[in-house]
Regions:
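Active-site-proximal polar cores
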Residues: 1-25
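Short, conserved turn/kink motifs that form compact alpha/beta structural patches or helix kinks used as
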Residues: 24-112
Length: 112
């Protein structure tokens, strides 16, 4: 039996830089697939945003492992989405000695 409860479907997304038609570029996110995860909250804080205060919350997200280089293995330049919630991946490592699970350290930013 697993010590992780992978009961939340989360979309793994990757950014693509596209021309915006005005000489610049726009960032567009597209889904690579769905991963089942367990979400564990960490520390949170409030900081000054451009318009209003912003809350920043850190999370640990546990997933089934995938080999290095696999498109199913998250990377720090990607993000996980659960509905309207977006979690930017900061770091990825093995969660257990057997290498059966991964832990993604992620940040969710929401308006306060």
């Amino acid at each position: 039996m697993s010590r992780y409860r992978l009961n939340r479907p989360m979309a793994l997304e990757e950014a693509a830089v596209l021309p915006d038609g005005a000489g610049g570029h726009a960032l567009e996110w597209h889904a690579l697939g769905t991963l089942w995860a367990e979400l564990r909250p960490g520390a949170g804080r409030e900081r000054r945003g451009e318009i209003a205060p912003e809350g920043t919350m850190l999370f640990r997200i546990f997933l089934r492992a995938a080999p290095q280089g696999s498109p199913q293995r998250p990377r720090p330049d990607q993000r996980l989405r659960e509905g309207a919630r977006i979690f930017r991946i900061l770091a990825v490592s093995e969660a257990d000695a057997a290498g059966a699970y991964l832990i993604c350290h992620a940040r969710e930013e929401v308006p306060a």
